[in-house]
Design a protein with these regions (language model features):
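C-terminal and inter-domain tail/linker signature
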Residues: 2, 9-20, 28-342
């Protein structure tokens, strides 16, 4: 695998000499591009803040395109494995399970036709949650969404919530389906190699800090940033598989990391967004489970789960990093949900 520094050096040197497989879109002038991104961010904020209010129906008609497609729900695995598949729209259903639910927007990033939003979900478990009876316990988890917009309307969205953290906070196990099956997320082989993403980013020479910051972050898929790449006060506030690491540390096997457990690990890129110093990268962690993972014995199964990194790059140096992966999806692929949840 190429080193991070070689990826970054080669990419910055390549400039406009690299070519995309598809046609290029003519970029908007800088001022128009900023205004367009700000409008898109406002639409996504409207989408979120109207949820659970009397204005929700009108707001959804206002902000969603007629052909709106939700590629992934936040509570994806619990919904897929629900005991009763007859629940209504997932948003309404979740508000029934948590009638005092509040969502707090923590971060928004806008880059052209795409917007990313990180929000915090809090509430009290008062109703049935996909087969989990009420526990009266509070929850406090994070969820994020990545949106695509056209003509001021949301055309696509992708969500991921902290489902493993949710189950841990409720002290609950994965509810059994009526047919006895477990719905496991597929391994699709999707996404794009980091080298291809770097080439795509460099069809036109990077014109400012956001574009260069994208390159810096994507190049980190070749190797973790070195001490020289990080600011003196660099902080990583969360690892992608945080709950599994906590589980492993509690059992004295904290060194059995995801990278050690997947000796052929090869991440693939789905999205990179940048605004100012902020960069979001959505990627797939993929490989064969050939080593122990925080006490989970090797299964030799192929795995592929999404992860999102939220970074801040200042003057070319890594300043902050926060990662969030689909830990419940990984456990489903390894058939290890019951082992971790007890």
């Amino acid at each position: 695998m190429p080193t991070r520094r070689k990826l970054l050096t080669d990419t910055l040197a390549a400039g406009a000499g690299l070519a995309l497989a598809g046609p290029l879109l003519r970029p908007l002038p800088a001022a128009a591009a900023i205004a367009n991104s700000q409008r898109n961010a406002a639409v996504v904020r409207r989408f979120k803040t109207a949820q659970g209010t009397k204005d929700e129906a009108d707001a959804m008609r206002e902000v969603l395109a007629p052909d709106y497609k939700r590629w992934r729900g936040g509570i994806e695995h619990l919904a897929a494995n629900a005991r009763d598949q007859g629940f209504p729209g997932p948003g309404s259903y979740l508000r029934g399970a948590f009638p005092d639910r509040t969502d707090t927007i923590e971060e928004v990033i806008a880059d052209g036709d795409r917007v990313g939003m990180l929000f915090r979900v809090r509430g009290t478990h008062k109703g049935n949650l996909f087969g989990i009876p009420p526990t009266d316990k509070p929850i406090d988890i994070r969820e994020l969404g990545i949106f695509r917009l056209a003509d001021g309307k949301i055309t696509e969205a992708w969500f991921m919530a902290d489902e493993l953290g949710l189950l841990q906070q409720l002290g609950a196990k994965m509810p059994a389906r009526r047919d006895g099956k477990r719905i496991v997320p597929p391994v699709t082989g999707g996404g794009e190699d980091a080298e291809a993403t770097l080439a795509r980013l460099n069809v036109q020479s990077p014109s400012g800090p956001p574009e260069r910051n994208k390159i810096t972050v994507v190049a980190s898929k070749g190797a973790a940033p070195s001490a020289a790449d990080r600011a003196a006060d660099f902080r990583q506030t969360r690892v992608g598989f945080q709950h599994l690491r906590d589980y492993g540390n509690a059992k004295g096997v904290g060194s059995e990391t995801i990278t050690a457990a997947l000796p052929d690990r090869h991440d693939r890129i789905d999205d990179v967004l940048a605004e100012g110093e902020k960069v979001w990268m959505r990627f797939r962690v993929a490989g064969t489970h050939g080593g122990r993972l925080y006490g989970i014995a090797p299964t030799q199964k192929r795995v592929e789960v999404p992860e999102v990194g939220i970074m801040r790059i200042t003057a070319g140096k890594w300043k902050e990093a926060w990662y969030f992966a689909d830990e419940l999806g990984l456990l489903l692929q390894l058939d290890a949900v019951d082992q971790v949840l007890g």
